[in-house]
Amino acid sequence: MADIKNLKPEEIWRNFDALTQVPRPSGHLEKVQAFLLDFAKKAGVEAFQDPAGNIVMRKPATPGFENRKGVILQAHMDMVPQKDKDSKHNFETDPIETIIDGDWVRANRTTLGSDDGLGVATIMAVMEAKDLQHGPVEGLITRDEETGMYGANELPAGELNGDILLNLDTESWGEFVIGSAGGIDITATLDYKEVETDKEDAAVKVTLKGLKGGHSGIEINEGRANANKCMVRFVREAVAELDARLASWQGGNMRNAIPFEAEVVLTLPKENVEALNDMIADWKDELKDEFKGIENVEKIEFFAENVETPKMEVPQEIQDNLIDAIYACHDGVLRMAPSMPDIVETSSNLAIIAIGEGKASVKILARSSHDGYKEYIATMMESCFSMAGMKVEFSGSYGGWNPNPESDILEHVLKVYKEQNGVDGKVQAVHAGLECSIILSKYPHLDVVSFGPTLLSPHTQNERCQISCVAPFWNLMKQLLTEIPEK
């Protein structure tokens, strides 16, 4: 494990290193909540856990800065628990093993948690700083952002006192975000009665892995391979040409990550197994050709293993309906933003498929900066899976964050950034969900901007943070807080 505590700036890396020792996957945050409250006590700042499970810290103004506008520093405490399939890491009990790799910090075959652990570490650094001059500062560290923005959605009105919100969940240094997409979760489910398999049939487990995966918002425009969509093309052909039957399917495990692995168990006549292996080899070549220049094609693995024939499988009519619905389901970019042609407006991610033992479940995350189109793609999915006899439910809907190019804090941030770096910052809207829109719905007076150091491949086991960006990010933060204007 690399000692990232020795990296500069020490204030950020020491606190981030401490965070990596505390398990904090979404949905299992008791340890990190206790850790943050204990940290605040040792730092001598007020802190409490609100009814939503968020941690709020308050640090009074430096003497002479009491009349400055109040600043809320905001980040989320949870991380996406993604890992290589053969990794033994337990996100609920094990610390993250960090590795320094040139100008990058990464983890050992797991997500790193820099999304949004670096934001949390920055809040910690501000709260414990003794030589930093600033007005009133609050830290809002939210719960379960990655699985539905629950902490922001349940944030009590009247809890925060600040005038400015600095969100620390942007992942490209030099970009200053003033708008983001809304989103909605779509879940299709079906209970079915399994049927007995033909005892004379063989069974194979077909695995597709080695895809990049990635963030289903930020990286959806790259056209990366979705393991579920690739798998359904093969399965549909195997069913049609080789009399294969579906026993089970497992693909993807995070709603907001492009699935990079999928596996199915198929039964089929023994005499067709060799033809199935040939078909898999052909599909592997096809995927390598289709995704050349997008995926690391030499890492793509697509193979079959002989397994014991399961006793039960999916009834043929239900199997065919499920395959058709998954095949027809839209995945990827649906529309680019008319006013910002380089930005995705609307997309969907066929994130998780679980079929077997009498239950089928499909989970999709749709995103759009246009509320009408968000509802359109959700009802499109509802139509698609309803035709397969599935029950479709919507949850976790949140609106987009509408840009305000006239923002005072944006102007101030851009001025300080140029003073320090000699170049103009880039003002951006992103095709990802940020908590800003939800917080603004409860605190509409806030002036908001989002920024942070560069992270690559968040939500994947390839996640990494660029070391050289963290020092200028911290320098910007310190000067911003010192120069916040008076009320």
Go through each PLM region and give its residues.
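Active-site-adjacent substrate-binding region
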Residues: 219, 226-228, 233-249, 403-446
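Midchain, well-structured core segments that form catalytic/ion-binding scaffolds
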Residues: 103-106, 146-147, 153-367
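Substrate-recognition/cap regions that form aromatic- and gly/pro-loop-enriched pockets
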Residues: 343-429
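Active-site metal-coordination/substrate-binding segment of hydrolases
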Residues: 65-163, 189, 203, 316, ...
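Zn-dependent metallopeptidase/amidohydrolase metal-coordination segment
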Residues: 9-12, 338-341, 345-360, 365, ...
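His/Asp/Glu-rich mid-to-C-terminal helical/loop segments that flank catalytic regions of hydrolases
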Residues: 158, 223-241, 268-273, 320-327, ...
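Acidic/His- and Gly-rich active-site-bordering loop/insert found
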Residues: 3-103
